[in-house]
């Protein structure tokens, strides 16, 4: 057998303090966009024992009750008493929100006077999109499995299957891969790690048995598990104190979990709490669509796309494509197809991906269990765009 290697991705649940903050920031964004699609939002959240603070810059015509959004979001996750890590109805909620800087406003959207194609990037930066043919979602398997384990933990907590579960939790999956001329081929799951918050009533043996039966079995396809697969289930031995009581939380601290689980690359910009003029978010969404479309159209088995911006400038400074040697045609030709097929100007990304539409918990949904590889019509950047190319070269 050819040489293999191990690669690991992690995820965290919606009750993890950093993810709680991401969800609050995006719930605020949803509320602003629902009433005023031109809202300019940069909303950060932090939390620690018995306290949540939202702060940042928001310019909107929307009438938003920030405190209610904070409490509702915490409650929906399951933070309903100090015992589980936070009491949504009795915790302190601090709000420190100002208008967007007038310097930024004039440079980016001319105080709302610019046409969509003229709107400049809200900041400088570079973003990456990635896709791989190893899963139906065109996402890395290690990341998909870690993410789905986290989502399943929440599901069995909320539906009562595992009543001992509490909201906070982390997952991690190590996959053994084979490199097939640049494409990634998963062979087996090497290690599964789950650390989940629990109540006082349950033993470690019960935790391990329940996690195997109700979380791991429904999520990880049998073909990837064998007698050598290693399981670390609550290896610390005790995880009763969790949520913001256990650790402080901040928006934007789980950017690898939000994207590709360590695969591809990351420009460093977080997503949650940002309206689509912030290219950290909209730029990353359009390059995911580009990379996914390249793989889905058969141009390559694996692909990364980079885009970069300057503040106030609509046109991207650079676009880059690398297919890791899996391209059916040269990368420079694929790059040309990408440039002809996708409009990377922030105002046009907003229109083409319908990113000004809030409500329906649209962005709140992105803030837990990943922004990519999700089968949901609100995730417009996951729609494959047919790319025109002459695939006779395959023969």
UniProtKB/Swiss-Prot annotation:
Pathway connected to this protein: Amino-acid biosynthesis; S-adenosyl-L-methionine biosynthesis; S-adenosyl-L-methionine from L-methionine: step 1/1
GO terms assigned for molecular function: ATP binding; metal ion binding; methionine adenosyltransferase activity
CDD domains: S-AdoMet_synt
Binding site for ATP: 16, 168-170, 236-239, 247, 253-254, 270, 274, 278
Catalysis: reaction(s): L-methionine + ATP + H2O = S-adenosyl-L-methionine + phosphate + diphosphate
Compartment list: Cytoplasm
Primary location: cytoplasm
Residues that, per the record, bind L-methionine: 57, 100, 247, 278
EC number(s) on file: 2.5.1.6
SUPFAM superfamilies: S-adenosylmethionine synthetase
The keyword Ion transport is assigned to this record: no
Keywords, sorted A to Z: ATP-binding, Cobalt, Cytoplasm, Magnesium, Metal-binding, Nucleotide-binding, One-carbon metabolism, Potassium, Transferase
Cofactor note: Binds 2 divalent ions per subunit. The metal ions interact primarily with the substrate. Can utilize magnesium, manganese or cobalt (in vitro).
Entry binding sites for K(+): 44
GO terms of biological process kind: one-carbon metabolic process; S-adenosylmethionine biosynthetic process
Quaternary structure annotation from Swiss-Prot or TrEMBL: Homotetramer.
Record-given protein name: S-adenosylmethionine synthase 5
Organism of derivation: Populus trichocarpa
Organismal lineage: Eukaryota, Viridiplantae, Streptophyta, Embryophyta, Tracheophyta
Protein encoded by which gene: METK5
